[in-house]
Design a protein with these regions (language model features):
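N-terminal strand-loop element at the rim of the active site
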Residues: 10-70, 172, 233-235
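A conserved mid-protein helix/loop that constitutes part of the nucleotide-sugar donor-binding site
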Residues: 18-26, 194, 198-217, 229, ...
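Short hydrophobic beta-strand element within catalytic cores of glycosyltransferases
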Residues: 38, 291-294, 304
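Short His-centered aromatic/hydrophobic patch
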Residues: 92-98, 117
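A short, well-ordered alpha-helix in the C-terminal region of glycosyltransferases
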Residues: 105, 320, 327, 334-349, ...
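Carbohydrate-associated surface elements
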Residues: 154, 176
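Conserved acidic donor-binding segment of nucleotide-sugar-dependent glycosyltransferases
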Residues: 305-307, 311-318, 327-332
Length: 365
């Protein structure tokens, strides 16, 4: 049997096409033909996978919230499905879904169980109770994991030194980007308006409220900026009702399948997340030549060097964020220089081909 016939199950929570799901899509399209996806319901991801003849199976009991009844139902359904299909590899994503998937896979005696950490959630927990709950869940999941993929050195440290994973089970494989597809706009001309963009779920983790407060403050001071938010999420409706302006300076675009063209026509990319693994959205923005203003957290700060290809600010600090944005207003030469640096940085370090080869080796070895 060749590696191409290996049966691989990818487990995701949401069928979106945001960063985590696009990482999965990139892996599936480049590696094996015999793939199956399990997620909570049908959506953009399952639609995109039709092109690759990938079977998609939905388990509606998979939810982000911890609910004992639903979680046990989801675990049982996962176990039955994995046992029936006899997968060689189960590759999980997301925190709680990843834990349920790993437990189900080991109970079904799957030979290789892999989990990708897209940012540990417990370091950013809002209370001690939440911290210890999420920490304990990740610690338990360790015993059901054969190989752990981390995207940055901070999560590698947490896995080995806090969760006590064995060193030979942890693999640092950063995300990668298709640099041919995500390329800068040729002969870009900067207007007097500073065009800002955020791509990501409008959710608690991404903290879009901090960005909206910062931009709203600048607009109230008559600073010539415009913000486009690309993405959906549980906070979209309430944020839109609070911050949408009649002058069109704050746009809630919703999700788009045309991220690359949206990035190209903007000037700066902003991501105010509370925690991350290694955001594909930042890699794609840098590859398109956008300097990035992002929070100083693991995953983000390994990609952005202050003053070189963007700048950093502390989480939930809308005042500092507004100052960082102001530092680019009326400075097209600064943006152009950091744009060139951003593109060069990606070309040297974060090609998609290199990343997929490392994942392939992990599957095969």
């Amino acid at each position: 049997m060749t590696a191409r016939t290996t049966k691989v199950l990818h487990l995701q929570l949401l069928p979106l096409l945001s960063g985590v799901q696009r990482v999965t899509l990139n892996e599936i399209s480049a590696l094996y033909t015999d793939y199956t996806l399990v997620c909570s319901k049908k959506g953009p991801l399952t639609k995109a996978l039709l092109e690759y003849d990938v079977d998609c199976h939905c388990i509606p009991e998979l939810t982000r919230e911890i609910t004992v009844k639903n979680d046990f139902k989801a675990l049982f359904k996962l176990y039955k499905f994995i046992k029936k299909e006899k997968f060689d590899i189960v590759h999980t994503h997301s925190s709680k879904t990843g834990i349920l998937g790993r437990v189900a896979a080991k109970l079904a005696r799957v030979g290789k169980v892999i989990h990708t950490v897209h940012g540990f959630s417990f370091p950013a927990a809002s209370s001690k109770k939440s911290y210890y709950l999420y920490f304990f869940m990740e610690w338990i999941a360790k015993f059901f994991t054969d190989k752990l993929i981390v995207l940055n050195v901070d999560d590698e440290y947490i896995a080995i030194n806090k969760l006590k994973f064995k060193r030979d089970k942890v693999f640092l494989i950063p995300n990668g980007v298709d640099t041919d597809k995500f390329s800068p706009l040729e002969n870009k001309i900067y207007s007097s308006t500073l065009n800002l963009v955020m791509v990501g779920r409008l959710s608690k983790q991404k903290d879009p409220e901090t960005l909206l407060l910062a931009v709203d403050k600048l607009l109230n001071e008559n600073v010539n900026v415009k913000l486009t938010l690309v993405g959906d999420g549980e906070l979209k409706e309430q944020l839109e009702s609070r911050f949408k302006r009649q002058d069109g300076r704050i746009i809630f675009h919703g999700w788009s399948d045309n991220i690359v063209n949206i990035l190209k026509v903007n000037d700066l990319f902003i991501l105010p997340s509370l925690w991350e693994g290694m955001p594909l959205a930042i890699l794609e923005a840098l590859s398109c030549g956008l300097p990035c203003i992002v929070t100083n957290i693991p995953g983000n700060n390994s990609l952005i060097e202050d003053g070189y290809n963007g700048c950093l600010f502390e989480i939930r600090d809308c005042q500092l964020l507004s100052q960082k944005i102001m530092s680019y207003v009326g400075k097209p030469e600064l943006i152009a220089q950091q744009s060139a640096n951003a593109r060069s940085f990606i070309l040297k370090n974060y090609g998609l081909f290199k990343r997929n080869n490392k994942v392939r080796q992990l599957y095969d070895n």
